[in-house]
């Protein structure tokens, strides 16, 4: 079999995309029905039976719409085929009824629907129009239900019988009989088709039930829901639902504005346009489904924004592509936390604008998490191309300027409250992170112009990063207090309390725990280094070797292990932070009271200074060691700094976690 060429692949790809778009479009009406049911309320003035019946019908409508929403593609198409066939049959019956029995039927058409004449009033033109209409209904009915052989012709003839009675001008009671008989035959045929398909429907339902139960037992509920979410393309359905809803509302409002202003111009004034936008935004988040739809639209915008920034700064990290997931989740959490859909229209607009400000700061934090690894990689790899550095520096400058501008605008339009305090704190925190990143970037760039090892570089990086981490931790504690004040005195809710617990755990407890663990590990590593003897001066020149870790020469001093291997103190400290063995021979790095005979192990290149045994070198070096490393002469996560120098940076991606405490 010949291989499929690129044109055929493109055709198949286009065919799949068309079917996928059609599938999404067919699922959208289910969301409209569910949204309409949720936005309608039963009339309390009716009897209890009527109220119970309405509630039952509402639940039944939600259940059926939900089932149709999650149907497979084949089952969904079959459902719409049968539904369309039944709709055509009902329309055909209604047309025959009104055309045959209502004398002023066409006058009713002429006085409705903007006065458009849909059919001619009398004569052969009327008969031909009715015949064509019934033929269209009949052919569509038998095609959708896949009725073959002579039965399809009989059904079409059955639909044309009332029209024939109208053409021959039969008496009214005979025409009534013909319409009733035609409707009865069509109804019986529909019931017969349903009875034939009932067996298929039963086995299909049973198969789906067994399949879902099997998947639930093997993979669990979470994976089952994720698979359904992806299979039905639920984010695309939400986007189409929200965009079509807003478009329909915009069309209606535009028509109302034009009628109110009594103008035929397509354009409207700026004030009317602003009112139109505000009304669309207010109605675009008036229910939980519309909030989900707005979240899906925000997800699409954030996704392409993240891809654009990644392409601009030249990053290829896969974890940085999660902006399209973080932004909508944060927006939806903020909407639930503040009760956005349940507020009055004026309050809803104000609350939505505040939530969007917090969302903007969160997106900027996430973008900083995307930019920082690229910035550190460029500086540590000593890339001197201006075209590689400019995009990252430009994005970093924007990340510093935008929070400042946002804070300036907010402080000039709002009075001080807990929400403004939270937004300002997030902006200041982002500016601080940018300053820390640019400072570390500058230090690494300065180090790139040195030909020797800058041993104090890691200490400076440690001071900068630790200072920034401490300030960020203080911001987290302050924001927790701000959220506690808001929950107790302004607007407390279970969702807010839950989010505060998450904030306290992730941004306060875990951050403090990890910081303390890092400090203790570094302290232990420093103590191990300080227990090793130091060699410097003339003995260092006699070694004539390089450090086995960084491959740089010994210029000022070196530490000697019990196995007589020499390393830079800084390099060995980084190694001991990972494991407690010698990088060369993998023996334990420790000093005992009585140093054992290690004469069988020499230094890095087998050299021993003349007139000196290895034991004497160790004892003399230990006696002459008068400089100890301080506990703060180390970096924040030394292994991370070494990775930065090699251009391999771990992406944190923690911008969204800092907003678990979003307040009013």
Curated annotation (Swiss-Prot):
SMART domains: RING (SM00184), RINGv (SM00744). Its EC number is 2.3.2.27. Residues 599-610 have a biased composition (Polar residues). Its main location: endoplasmic reticulum. The modification N-acetylalanine is found at residue 2. Pathway: Protein modification; protein ubiquitination. One of its GO terms (molecular function) is zinc ion binding. Residues 599-664 are annotated as: Disordered. SUPFAM superfamilies: RING/U-box. PANTHER family: E3 UBIQUITIN-PROTEIN LIGASE RNF139, RING ZINC FINGER PROTEIN. The RING-type zinc finger domain may be essential for ubiquitin ligase activity. E3-ubiquitin ligase; acts as a negative regulator of cell proliferation through mechanisms involving G2/M arrest and cell death. Required for MHC class I ubiquitination in cells expressing the cytomegalovirus protein US2 before dislocation from the endoplasmic reticulum (ER). Affects SREBP processing by hindering the SREBP-SCAP complex translocation from the ER to the Golgi, thereby reducing SREBF2 target gene expression. Involved in the sterol-accelerated degradation of HMGCR. This is achieved through binding to INSIG1 and/or INSIG2 at the ER membrane. This is E3 ubiquitin-protein ligase RNF139. It comes from Pongo abelii.
């Amino acid at each position: 079999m010949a291989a499929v060429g690129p044109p055929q692949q493109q055709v198949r790809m286009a065919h799949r995309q068309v079917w996928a778009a059609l599938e999404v479009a067919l699922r959208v009406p289910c969301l409209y029905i569910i949204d309409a049911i949720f936005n309608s309320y039963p009339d309390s003035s009716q009897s209890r039976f009527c109220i119970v019946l309405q509630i039952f019908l509402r639940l039944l409508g939600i259940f059926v719409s939900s089932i149709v929403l999650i149907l497979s593609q084949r089952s969904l198409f079959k459902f719409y085929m049968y539904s369309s066939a039944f709709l055509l049959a009902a329309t055909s019956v209604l047309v025959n009824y009104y055309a045959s029995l209502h004398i002023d039927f066409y006058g009713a058409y002429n006085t409705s629907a903007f006065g458009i004449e849909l059919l001619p009033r009398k004569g052969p033109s009327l008969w031909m129009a009715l015949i064509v209409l019934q033929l269209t209904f009949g052919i569509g009915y038998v095609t959708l239900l896949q009725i073959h052989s002579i039965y399809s012709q009989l059904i079409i003839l059955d639909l044309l019988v009332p029209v024939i009675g109208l053409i021959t001008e039969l008496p009214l009671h005979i025409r009534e009989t013909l319409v009733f008989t035609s409707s009865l035959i069509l109804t019986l045929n529909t019931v017969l088709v349903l009875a034939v398909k009932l067996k298929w429907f039963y086995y299909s339902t049973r198969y789906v039930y067994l399949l879902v139960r099997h998947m639930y037992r093997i993979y669990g509920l979470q994976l089952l829901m994720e698979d359904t979410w992806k299979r039905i393309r639920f984010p695309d359905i939400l986007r189409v639902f929200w965009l079509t809803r807003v478009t329909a509302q915009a069309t209606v409002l535009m028509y109302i504005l034009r009628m109110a202003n009594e103008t035929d111009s397509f354009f409207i004034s700026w004030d009317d346009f602003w009112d139109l936008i505000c009304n669309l935004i207010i109605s675009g988040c008036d229910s939980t489904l519309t909030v989900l739809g707005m979240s899906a639209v925000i997800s699409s915008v954030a996704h392409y924004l993240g891809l654009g920034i990644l392409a601009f700064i030249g990053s290829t990290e896969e974890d940085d592509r999660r902006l399209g997931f973080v932004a909508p989740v944060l927006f939806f959490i903020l909407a639930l936390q503040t009760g956005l859909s349940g507020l009055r229209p004026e309050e809803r607009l104000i609350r939505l604008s505040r939530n969007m400000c917090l969302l903007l700061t969160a997106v900027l934090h996430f973008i900083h998490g995307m930019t920082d690894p690229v910035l550190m990689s460029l500086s540590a790899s000593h890339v001197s191309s201006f075209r590689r550095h400019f995009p990252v520096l430009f994005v970093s400058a924007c990340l510093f300027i935008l929070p400042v501008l946002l804070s300036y605008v907010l402080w000039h339009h709002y009075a001080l409250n807990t929400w403004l305090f939270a937004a300002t704190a997030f902006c200041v925190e982002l500016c601080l992170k940018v300053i820390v990143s640019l400072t570390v970037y500058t230090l690494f760039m300065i180090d790139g112009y040195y030909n020797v090892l800058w041993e104090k570089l890691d200490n400076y990086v440690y001071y900068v990063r630790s200072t920034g981490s401490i300030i960020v931790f203080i911001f987290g504690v302050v924001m927790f207090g701000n959220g506690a004040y808001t929950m107790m005195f302004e607007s407390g809710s279970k969702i807010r309390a839950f989010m505060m617990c998450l904030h306290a755990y992730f941004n306060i407890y875990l951050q403090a725990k990890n910081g303390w663990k890092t400090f203790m590990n570094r302290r232990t590593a420093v103590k191990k280094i300080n227990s090793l003897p130091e060699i410097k001066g003339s003995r260092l020149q006699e070694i004539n070797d390089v450090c086995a870790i960084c491959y740089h020469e010994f210029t000022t001093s070196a530490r000697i292990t019990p196995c007589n291997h020499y390393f830079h103190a800084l390099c060995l400290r980084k190694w001991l932070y990972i494991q407690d063995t010698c990088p060369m021979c993998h023996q334990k790095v420790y000093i005992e009271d009585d140093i054992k005979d290690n004469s069988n192990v020499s230094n890095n290149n087998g050299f021993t200074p003349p007139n000196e045994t290895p034991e004497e070198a160790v004892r003399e070096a230990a006696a002459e060691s008068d400089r100890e490393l301080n506990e703060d002469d180390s970096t924040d996560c030394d292994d991370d700094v070494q990775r930065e120098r090699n251009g391999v940076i771990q992406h944190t991606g923690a911008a969204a976690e800092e907003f678990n405490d979003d307040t009013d």
